UniProtKB/Swiss-Prot annotation:
Similarity field: Belongs to the eukaryotic ribosomal protein eS6 family.
Domain of life per record: Archaea
Keyword Ribonucleoprotein attributed: yes
Any matching Pfam family: Ribosomal_S6e
Protein name, as recorded: Small ribosomal subunit protein eS6
GO BP annotations, alphabetical order: translation
UniProt keyword terms in alphabetical order: Ribonucleoprotein, Ribosomal protein
UniProt GO MF annotations: structural constituent of ribosome
Gene Ontology CC annotations of this record: ribonucleoprotein complex; ribosome
Organism: Pyrococcus horikoshii (strain ATCC 700860 / DSM 12428 / JCM 9974 / NBRC 100139 / OT-3)
Transmembrane intervals: none
Length: 125
């Protein structure tokens, strides 16, 4: 049985809430990629109870990233659910200390798999 920590951010209010989903709702996320949008109704979440305000009926969640079981971040430019070691100069998974610095870092692909533990999403309405 798959379990995900789902970090839901509301960009209009600047509030983020973390919940845990498992079972059939978590299985619906497997195979989705960064940038995909999922209707909130599909996961059966009650946003009013979480955020304390009403949302439109057609509100969706856009996947923005996540981390795997060992803490490696997902990158939108690496395709598939694989873990790779790539040379990075900027972006998710690397913060350069000097101008022009590049390093090899391990990152996760852009597809959600059972090895992913945390999924970051933002509300789109």
């Amino acid at each position: 049985m798959t379990t995900f920590k789902l970090v839901i951010s509301d960009p209009k209010s600047g509030i983020a809430k973390q919940i845990e989903i498992s079972g059939a709702n978590a299985e619906k996320l497997i195979g989705k990629k960064i940038g995909d949008q999922i209707p909130v109704k599909e996961l059966g979440l009650d946003l009013k109870a979480l955020f304390g305000k009403d949302f439109p009926e057609d509100v969706k969640m856009e996947i923005r990233g996540g981390t795997d079981k060992d803490g490696f971040p997902m990158r939108p430019d690496i395709h598939g659910p694989r873990r790779v070691r790539i040379l990075l100069s900027k972006g998710p998974g690397f913060r350069p200390k000097e101008k022009g610095e590049r390093r090899k870092k391990t990152v996760r692909g852009n597809t959600i798999s059972p090895e992913i533990v945390q999924v970051n999403v933002k509300l789109v309405y």
